[in-house]
Each structure stands twice: as structure tokens, then as C-alpha cells.
Amino acid sequence: MSITPREIVSELDAHIIGQTEAKRAVAIALRNRWRRMQLSEDLRQEVTPKNILMIGPTGVGKTEIARRLAKLAQAPFIKVEATKFTEVGYVGKEVDSIIKDLTEVSMKLVKEQAVEKNRIRAQDAAEDRILDVLLPPAKDQWGNVQETDNASTRQIFRKKLREGSLDDKEIDIDVASQVNVEIMTPPGMEEMTSQLQSLFEGMSPNKTQKRKMKIKDALKVMLDEEAAKLVNQEELKQQAIEAVEQHGIVFIDEIDKICKKSGNSGGDVSREGVQRDLLPIIEGSTVNTKYGMVKTDHILFICSGAFQIARPSDLLPELQGRLPIHVELKSLTKADFERILTEPNASLTLQYRELMKTEGVTIEFTQDGISKIAESAFRVNEKTENIGARRLHTVLERLMDGISFDANERAGEHIVIDEKYVATALNDVVENEDLSRFIL
């Protein structure tokens, strides 16, 4: 992917307000993946990614940056919560499962790309199978197929099939029968589950079963079957592993929750252990997955945390060293809230306008109304827990509560949400100090 850092930041700007430093850091890291691939083979092996630690309060855009980056990257990407993992020896998921899950994501990605690449051939083959059911080949008295008489009719039906005029017609088709084996295992033993499922599914013979379904559904099933025939599974595995090793990105959220708090001498079960287990994976090691061995040397790791109780210095020194780029995200201001309400491509005000439009109600947010909403959300954050932009959801839901409830009875109305309307709807926030009802 040859998208430039400026283009990456511009794309992130369309969805996330502020946090320029964090956007620049991830943009450079993403571009460096492409730069590295342009180097000679020997030098490429020596260039390792500069992992990132994003520090900032909740609700300022850390997770959203990761989510949008995943779409931009067009590469294997996985987001995990550090708190979901336990030290080796404890019940729960081990950190190796991060790489295994990333490989699964990569496998799905390359499979989709391979299917898309062969889609035209698979589409033709699937259509032929449907047409064989609709128009069984005519045979003469000796059993030979008469193609000439049938060819023109098949072309007419193929055209109808592509136009969708036969979509709702039901037909009987032969589809590959799959043995679905559900195995329940304790947490942390997911790999054994997948291996047993593969074993049982592999033991079942390749049988087909007749199923009655609409042509539009049958076409999808047959398209998948034909595409699978055109794909080399072993080749896909190699491509998936290479994609993980060279382009994989892991986003680890809530990294601060596995820190041992300063001055706390209590037994934080497996917290430091999780950090120690993360060390070799981030530094570079080999993890065994069901598709083969995966080297983690060139996987990019982006960690994030609020660090409200713990501090970045509470991380193990070795782990700090493996996260050389530290980016601090700033708390959101009232002006930021105003921009969040209006500027993103799918801003909150736009979402509410479009939702109410489905009921025939026209909503208009005035500038002073938006300013009042931002002020209310900012004030609640200051008075209680600061949950960043998530507070806007709470305030807007309260503001729109009455309209949302009886919108179906108000079709055709034009409702203007200005400063006066907001002040009335959020009266208990504006006038009272008791803000408990807004605390999530």
C-alpha cells in the first residue's frame, strides 16, 4: 500500500477530531511498512518496526484511530484488550493467541482476495450449474448431448439470471454437505477445539445433499463452492503467513490495566506475567499456528492506555524499551466537542438527522444549539468522570429522548434544536449541580 502519511492523516481527519500527533505517528509507522518493502532483502530483515505507545484519557480517540487504521491498512489487523490475557499457567487466554488470531484474520483476508480474483470464472461456473438445473442438456436417442439446439436458450436464461428476473424461483441443487461439530472446551484451549473440529471434518467423506432454495441463494452457495475449487489452499496458507509477518498490525488496548501500580505491594496475579509474556512476541519470536510457524519480528505493535492510576513508567522496563515511540493524546475541549458534533463524515448530528428523517421528521441543529450541547457535555465531564467524546452520546440521547419516542406521530414536522431548546431539555444539567443521572 503506497498511501502517503499526509493522505493517511487526511483520511483520519475525516473521522477523528484533533490528536494530530497520534495521527502522524501511526501514519509514519504505516508508511514505513511500505518503505521497508522497497529495500533489498538483506537490509529489509534488519529494519524493524518502531512500536507505538499511545497515552491519553478515555474517549479521546485512541481506539477510533486503531479502528480507522485497520480499514486504511488493507493488511492483517487485530485489536485486543490486554486484560483478556493471563500468564502462562493460569486459566485464560495466553498472549500467543494474539498471533494465532491475527493469522486467522490474514487467512480470511487472502482468501477473500483470491475469491475476488477468480470471481468471474467462479461466476460463470456457478451460472452453468444453475442453468444445468433449469435446462437439463437435451440428449438424442443414443444419449449424446445436443448442444446446438440448447445453446441459444441457455443464453436467454443466462441473461435473465444476470438481470435477476429468476431470483425468486426455487430449484433443487446438489451442495456439498458439511459436518458441523461443536466442541466445548475450557477457556485457553481454543486451539485444541479448532484442531479437533478440523480432524472430524476431515474424516467425513465429500458427500453432497439436495437442497431446495431460491435461485439468488443457490447462486451464492455455488459461487462459494466454485471459488473454493479455484483456490490453492496451501498457497493461501503461505500468503497468509507472509502477510502477517511483513504487514501485520496488532493494537493492544488497556495496556495500563496490566501495570503493577506504584507503591502497591499486593499480589497482582499474572499482571507482570502477561507483560513478560508479551516481551518476546513484541521483540520478535516464532509462534506456532495451525497454518504454520509465524515470525513476529516485523509485526507492528500499537499499545494504548489511559494511565490514570498507573503510569507508563510502571510498565516493565524491557517492555517500555520495546515501545520506543510515545504519543500523548490530549483531553478534549468544548471547541473539540463542537467539531465532533459537526465535522466528521458521519457526525452525531448527521446520524440523528438521518434517523429522524426515516420517520418523516426534519431536524435542524443551529450553531448556538450545537455550542450549548458541547458546553453541557464538557461541563458534565468536568464535574464528574471525564469520559471524553463518549459523553456526547449520553447528552444527545437525553436531548433527543422526547423526539425519538414520538417521532412516528410527528411526521412532517420541522424541529429546530437551538440554544433555548437545548437549555430546556437539559435543564437539570444547566441549573443543577446534581449530575448523577448523567454518570454512565
Curated annotation (Swiss-Prot):
Tell where it localizes: Cytoplasm
Per its UniProt record, what SMART domains does this chain match?
Answer: AAA, ClpB_D2-small
Q: Name one GO biological process term.
A: protein unfolding
Q: Which InterPro entries match?
A: AAA+_ATPase, ATP-dep_Clp_protease_ClpX, ATPase_AAA_core, Clp_ATPase_C, HslU, P-loop_NTPase
Entry keyword Electron transport: no
Instruction: Indicate the quaternary assembly.
Output: A double ring-shaped homohexamer of HslV is capped on each side by a ring-shaped HslU homohexamer. The assembly of the HslU/HslV complex is dependent on binding of ATP.
User: Which GO molecular function annotations are given, in alphabetical order?
Assistant: ATP binding; ATP hydrolysis activity; peptidase activity; proteasome-activating activity
Q: Report the family membership.
A: Belongs to the ClpX chaperone family. HslU subfamily.
Q: What does this protein do?
A: ATPase subunit of a proteasome-like degradation complex; this subunit has chaperone activity. The binding of ATP and its subsequent hydrolysis by HslU are essential for unfolding of protein substrates subsequently hydrolyzed by HslV. HslU recognizes the N-terminal part of its protein substrates and unfolds these before they are guided to HslV for hydrolysis.
Q: Does the keyword Translocase apply?
A: no
Which sequence ranges form a coiled-coil region, renumbered to this chain?
A: none
Q: Name one GO cellular component term.
A: HslUV protease complex
Which UniProt key words apply to this protein?
A: ATP-binding, Chaperone, Cytoplasm, Nucleotide-binding
Q: What's the protein name? A: ATP-dependent protease ATPase subunit HslU
Report the gene name: hslU
Determine the domain of life of the protein's source: Bacteria
